[in-house]
Amino acid sequence: MRAVVQRVTRAKCTVDGAVTGETGPGLLVLLGVAPQDSADTARTLAAKLAKLRIFNDDAGKMNRSVQDIGGGVLSISQFTLFADTSRGNRPSFTGAASPKQGRELYAEFNAALRALGLPVGEGVFGAHMDIELVNDGPVTVTLDI
């Protein structure tokens, strides 16, 4: 499972002109699922993400988590995180999970974040989405579990 995590002051997902999810200060998470991933992988990543200290403390050091600041998460499924461009110029996505598995584990990941007390906005799995964000820092971290 792979997550590209961006610290944001706000982020919003829109599908066909309707807002499907948003957050104020917190995290935008682009989530990719691989064939070997499981519900346990999703829960492990959610726990890591909730405790990831990428928010500044009073001294300006990255020492606070999204839980510590009372922030939220906008979670977006993105199979393209497993693109392989090693052969030619057109990406291959054979490293990504099947749509069925991806949908199930995306839902499991979001449920695990909520179980940890985080408010979670969501994109729409498999849809063409417009994502707006204000990256704070910028701070962008990649997590592979």
From Swiss-Prot:
Entry remark concerning the domains of this protein: A Gly-cisPro motif from one monomer fits into the active site of the other monomer to allow specific chiral rejection of L-amino acids.
Organism encoding this protein: Deinococcus radiodurans (strain ATCC 13939 / DSM 20539 / JCM 16871 / CCUG 27074 / LMG 4051 / NBRC 15346 / NCIMB 9279 / VKM B-1422 / R1)
Protein known as: D-aminoacyl-tRNA deacylase
Principal localisation: cytoplasm
Keywords: Cytoplasm, Hydrolase, RNA-binding, tRNA-binding
Subcellular location: Cytoplasm
Gene name as annotated: dtd
MF GO annotations: D-tyrosyl-tRNA(Tyr) deacylase activity; Gly-tRNA(Ala) deacylase activity; Ser(Gly)-tRNA(Ala) hydrolase activity; tRNA binding
GO biological process: D-amino acid catabolic process; tRNA metabolic process
GO CC, alphabetical: cytoplasm
Function: An aminoacyl-tRNA editing enzyme that deacylates mischarged D-aminoacyl-tRNAs. Also deacylates mischarged glycyl-tRNA(Ala), protecting cells against glycine mischarging by AlaRS. Acts via tRNA-based rather than protein-based catalysis; rejects L-amino acids rather than detecting D-amino acids in the active site. By recycling D-aminoacyl-tRNA to D-amino acids and free tRNA molecules, this enzyme counteracts the toxicity associated with the formation of D-aminoacyl-tRNA entities in vivo and helps enforce protein L-homochirality.
Enzyme class, spelled out: hydrolase
Keyword Iron-sulfur: no
